[in-house]
Each structure stands twice: as structure tokens, then as C-alpha cells.
């Protein structure tokens, strides 16, 4: 006899004595756990399907081991922002051996210590709420970080120059430079190689672009 069960948001086809890795169940090694979400059961070609679960059907399993899955690496990179993030995750797993497939409300031979699907459902419901809370908190953190971040350079007093006169600097680039404290041709002309490297690291402009603007700014600053 086999059964199709649902636990931890996944479906498994199981039979007696099968070894199975499911999402972590809070139980000790040797404990019996109950899986009451039985979607179908059958033997050979005779299969009974539930709507969605089969009434009175129950699968019990013995906890064999508590462990973790292999590490999954998530790598995120944002173009032209020099932002890279690497996150590793290891899913907690419980290895169980299927003990019995019970039908018609039959009672298990051994009393279960815990119901597997109950724990899995609580974890599954908690995960979206936690993710939503983090998602709502993220924009606030970004706004705080942006507010707290100081410009790369100190803007001089006086009237700013029109940086768009320099070939290669458009309105958007000029605005970005102004926000970082660069507002005059003289500033651009006096940029050191160290300053160029700083802009290259923190702004979406290449070192070659900045050096070209610096040379143009030197000529404009003389006028």
C-alpha cells in the first residue's frame, strides 16, 4: 500500500519502511510523528483520492535523524552600483522512516509525540509574515541610510557652474555630481587620482570618463 502525503508545503509518495527527508519537525530521534494530510492512498491500480484530504487517513513515521540540507548560495549584484551580496542558506531537515499507513480512522500502534503538518503549517504561515515585515522595514532602512550618507566632497561657496557644458555630462550625471558636492569646473579640474578612484567606486561613472571630464574642466576653468 502507498499514500501521497503533504508536509512542509511538499507532496511525497510513501510506503511502509520508506526513508524520507522532510522539513524540520520538532521531535527527538526515535519519536513517532503523525502526518494527517493524506491526499491519496492505494494499492496497485486501485487509488482513492481525497478532497483535498482523505477522511480518516493517517500516516505515522519514526524520526531517524535531525540534520541540514546542503548549503544553497544566493548571489545578487546590482549593475553600475558596485553592490554585491552573497547569502548562504541551509534548510533544516528531519529524516523519518514511514511506520504505518492507517485508513478509516484506525489508531496507530504507537502514540505520536507530535503532528508533523501542524508544525510545518505554523512555520509556513510565519515565513510570509516575517518576509513581509522585512520587506516593509527595508525601504525605511534605505531611506535612513540615504539620509545619513554624507556627500563624497564638500561643495564650495558661490555659484555653481553648468557641468553639462562638459562633453559626456548630461543633466542626470550633472545632478549626481552636484549631490556629491561637485558643482564647479575648478573642482573637477583639481580632482586627484585618489578622488577619481573614490568616484569610480561610489558612483556609476568609470575612471576613464572622470579623467576625460577632468581634462575638459581644466580648459573651462581657465576661462
UniProtKB/Swiss-Prot annotation:
Pfam families: Ribosomal_L21p. SUPFAM superfamilies: L21p-like (SSF141091). InterPro entries: bL21-like, bL21-like_sf, Ribosomal_bL21. One of its GO terms (biological process) is translation. Keywords: Ribonucleoprotein, Ribosomal protein, RNA-binding, rRNA-binding. GO terms for cellular component: cytoplasm; ribonucleoprotein complex; ribosome. One of its GO terms (molecular function) is rRNA binding. Part of the 50S ribosomal subunit. Contacts protein L20. This protein binds to 23S rRNA in the presence of protein L20. HAMAP family: Ribosomal_bL21 (MF_01363). PANTHER family: 50S RIBOSOMAL PROTEIN L21, LARGE RIBOSOMAL SUBUNIT PROTEIN BL21M. Belongs to the bacterial ribosomal protein bL21 family. This is Large ribosomal subunit protein bL21. It comes from Mesorhizobium japonicum (strain LMG 29417 / CECT 9101 / MAFF 303099). The gene is rplU.
